[in-house]
UniProtKB/Swiss-Prot annotation:
Residues 159-178 bind DNA. Coiled coil: none annotated. This is Putative HTH-type transcriptional regulator YhjB. PANTHER family: HTH-TYPE TRANSCRIPTIONAL REGULATOR YHJB-RELATED. It comes from Escherichia coli (strain K12).
């Protein structure tokens, strides 16, 4: 597993490198402090997990994530932040952000978040966002099959895996997902999975 840490504190990168390498076999961690440096590393590892320092300026982080996801659509993102309730964090979730972890979390929590994000699963703090009534109503309006598919999607299953488990074609899975996205007013798998996670 390749991780690129974009962080203003080299000591945080160093500490995380030592700690995660002790807990995740075969993990390789590189640090970057400039946007060009990050993109250069992602040229070599376009499917890497990016750990972004969320304590930097919100507008800068938004810009960086937007640019990064356009250039490297396969990249997965984990954000570390002292305050996980910053408004901009909710606005960037659709930029392949799969995990948001408080910077003072234990190493075990970071390892769990990294492994979850690497598998395409969401990892968000329990109190990360208050659940709007609308989200719950939208989820209740889904059919039983759509809820089933959404649950599997949130667990990181691919369309092919969902189709195999439910004995339906991948085309049918895709059609269900498109209908589900419209119903929930979301644009992608990550946003749909997040709605399920925050309402449960």
């Amino acid at each position: 597993m390749q991780i690129v840490m974009f962080d203003r504190q080299s000591i945080f990168i160093h500490g995380m490198k030592i700690s995660l390498q002790q807990r995740i076999p075969g993990v390789s961690i590189q640090g970057a402090s400039q946007a060009d440096e990050l993109w250069q590393k992602l040229e070599s590892y376009p499917e890497a997990l990016v750990m972004l320092d969320g304590d930097q300026d919100g507008e800068f982080c938004y810009w960086l994530l937007q640019k990064t996801v356009v250039q490297f659509p396969e990249v997965k993102v984990l954000i570390t932040a002292t305050d996980c309730n910053k408004r901009w964090l909710q606005e960037v979730i659709h930029f392949n952000v799969l995990a948001i972890v408080p910077r003072d979390s234990t190493v075990e929590t970071f390892a769990l978040a990294v492994n979850s994000a690497a598998m395409g699963m969401m990892f968000l703090p329990g109190d990360w966002r208050t659940t709007p009534e609308k989200d719950i109503k939208d989820l209740k309006s889904l059919s039983a099959r759509q809820r089933e598919i959404l649950t599997m999607l949130a667990a990181g299953e691919s369309n092919k895996e969902i189709g195999r488990a439910l004995n339906i074609s991948t085309g049918t899975v895709k059609a269900h997902l498109e209908s589900l996205y419209r119903r929930l007013e979301v644009k992608n798998r990550t946003q749909a999975a997040m709605m399920l996670n925050i309402s449960s």
